Design a protein with these regions (language model features):
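Interfacial segments of multi-pass membrane proteins
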Residues: 30-44, 185-200
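Generic transmembrane alpha-helix signature in multi-pass membrane proteins
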Residues: 60-69, 174-176, 186-191, 211-226
Length: 245
């Protein structure tokens, strides 16, 4: 038992370090490692991954709140849709065949690789010149932050809130279904669809992962797909690894 706990802790540390270095979060690493290397059922691996995402995001929540790039109003509004999506995704996970989950996970990894490639080759931030749409205007969703790299204050407005909300719902579904933070989809919603600057989108997405993860974790706990012996050492390891990375 001690060997098992030690091994799972090392898996968590590895996932936390790799996730921090690649900007993916530990969740996207844990599920394939547990299923392919240790033969863990993918549904229990997803449950462990969800808790790991929750642990890392909770540990970083204070830092995100202090980040002036975070748009808290947008985060709270869009969490309505990601949380609804998370409950739908968690329910789907119960009835979805394991082979389908593997296929979805492989597709997601390809999308994540493409997303990383774009980030590497596109260094420019999206300084939005769009105007607030009616919903954004009413809810005052625009924002500003000081960009230390550019040494100037970036002011921005947001548009296409309905379109961004739909993508956020999908992000919530994928997050709960596959046990990931789904940050790539959340950034896609804010940066590409809603025309927010990339830095503000990333900071806001990172903050949102904890809320989405909580909704998913509650359902996974309720249906018995969270194994404490598996989850505890992995979550502690990911938390430690994320600080090291």
């Amino acid at each position: 038992m001690l060997t098992y706990i030690f091994t799972m802790t090392l898996v968590g540390i590895f996932a936390g370090i790799l996730g921090a270095l690649l900007g993916l979060g530990g969740g996207i690493v844990i599920t394939p490692v547990l299923t392919l290397l240790f033969g863990v059922d993918i549904k229990y691996a997803v449950g462990a991954s969800i808790i790991a995402v929750l642990a890392t995001s909770s540990g970083s929540a204070i830092a995100y709140l202090k980040d002036d790039m975070l748009n808290l109003r947008i985060a709270m509004f869009l969490e309505i849709f990601t949380t609804l999506g998370a409950f739908v995704g968690a329910m789907l996970s119960v009835i979805t065949d394991s082979q389908v989950l593997f296929l979805l996970y492989g597709t997601l990894m390809l999308f994540q690789a493409f997303n990383m490639y774009q980030k590497i080759h596109d260094k420019k931030d999206n300084q939005s010149v769009s105007h607030n749409d009616a919903i954004a205007e009413k809810l005052n969703l625009g924002g500003e932050y000081f960009d230390k790299g550019l040494n100037q204050t970036i002011k921005y407005q947001v548009t296409n809130v309905p379109g961004g909300s739909v993508v956020m719902f999908f992000a919530g579904v994928m997050s709960a279904l596959l046990g990931i933070g789904a940050g790539a989809f959340k950034v896609l919603a804010m940066d590409t669809v809603m025309k927010m600057p990339l830095k503000a989108s990333s900071a806001t997405s990172n903050f949102m992962m904890g809320v989405t993860g909580t909704a998913s974790a509650i359902f996974y706990l309720f249906v018995g797909q969270i194994n404490p012996v598996l989850v505890t050492p992995i979550a502690l390891g990911v938390l430690a690894g994320s600080f090291i990375g």
